[in-house]
Amino acid sequence: MLPVECTGTSKIESDGLKEQPTPQTYKGTRSYVCSGGDLLAPTAVESVVEGTANSSCTKLSATTRETLTWPDGTTSEIEIPIEVAIEPGAVDVRVTGTVVKGKYAGGGVTSTIPMPRCGPPARVEGPAAMTITPAAPVA
């Protein structure tokens, strides 16, 4: 099956990044338009994002869970472990994960998301993109 390509926007409430690693939680939503794979036409997909982190202004260290809800009511639960150095001036970050449950379970995920800023709590908004590569069928 061909990959599913999604583009859209992300709105995440963040505790903000500090100079030293700080435990925190975050949550928000993403809105995508997805196509490819087994989708017959471009499809609007909503997701809920939540996670925990121990990040700083120089390093993202987090576990993100994103649950996509497809128009037919099925869901895909995605887990993305993040361990990434923050480059000065970066506006987004590319991460990889796995569909752990639901539609496309076992598939790989590559996601590009807005980079949180160093500073006080804030809403992190910006473009988001995701590619889901479905797992090969078991023979």
Residues of each region from the PLM?
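Amphipathic hydrophobic-ligand
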Residues: 2-11
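Extracellularly exposed regions in secreted/surface proteins, prominently low-complexity, repeat-rich
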Residues: 92, 96-139
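A broad structural signal for short, well-ordered beta-strand segments within beta-sheet-rich domains
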Residues: 6, 23, 63, 123-127
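Predominantly extracellular/secreted and cell-surface proteins with exposed
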Residues: 10-97
